[in-house]
Structure formats: C-alpha cells, structure tokens
C-alpha cells in the first residue's frame, strides 16, 4: 500500500495492521509502517495497532525544502510534542505502555 491506495478495494494500513501484528507475534520480525504518517497522533495509532516503528518521508522533504534544517527541527519537535500529548491523554507513560485498546479503527 506504499504511496497511497493504488487499488480502490485495498484495505487501509490501519485496517490490516492488527492482523499482521498478531500473525507475527513472537516471530522476532519487526513491523515498520510507511505511508500516511504525518502527525504524532498518527505515530501513536500505528504503534497502538502493532507497529514497532514508523517511517516518515514526505513531511521531512517538505520541511527541508521549505526551511532547511530549521524546518526539519520544527517538524521533529511538533511530532514529539503531539506524540507526548497523545500518550499523556491516553495514560501511556512510555512507548511500551501504548496498547491496542487505546485506539479504534
């Protein structure tokens, strides 16, 4: 599903991520989610649904194109703040405390 929903009938990443995470549980395989991650809330949702990490590209390209290294730092600070706020509102004090029952798909 990289680059958008190319096929109309393809499910969104968030719809299939919990199933993938369950199928890979205990295998040692890390789940990296790419595509559509723009905010700290998006990062939180992906982690809650079973991702081990997220990959973000386009927003960083936009940030560096618009304001160089300073733009990237502003974007990183924004992501970190949004993630921290979302975690706090959901009662998660660490990344390890983010759980599936904190989000709805």
Label for each model-derived stretch:
Residues 1-11, 61-64:
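Glycine-rich, proline-tolerant flexible connector loops at the mouths of alpha/beta enzymes
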Residues 15-33, 38-105:
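Alpha/beta catalytic cores of nucleotide-metabolism and tRNA/nucleoside-modifying enzymes
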């Amino acid at each position: 599903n990289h680059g958008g929903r190319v096929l109309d009938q393809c499910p969104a990443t968030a719809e299939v991520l919990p199933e993938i995470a369950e199928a890979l549980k205990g295998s040692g395989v890390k789940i990296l989610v790419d595509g559509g991650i723009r905010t700290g809330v998006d990062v939180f949702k992906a982690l809650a649904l079973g991702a081990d990490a997220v990959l973000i590209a386009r927003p960083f390209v936009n940030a560096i194109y618009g304001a160089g290294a300073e733009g990237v730092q502003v974007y990183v600070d924004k992501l970190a703040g949004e993630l921290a706020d979302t975690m706090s509102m959901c009662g998660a004090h660490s990344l390890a405390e983010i759980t599936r029952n904190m989000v709805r798909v």
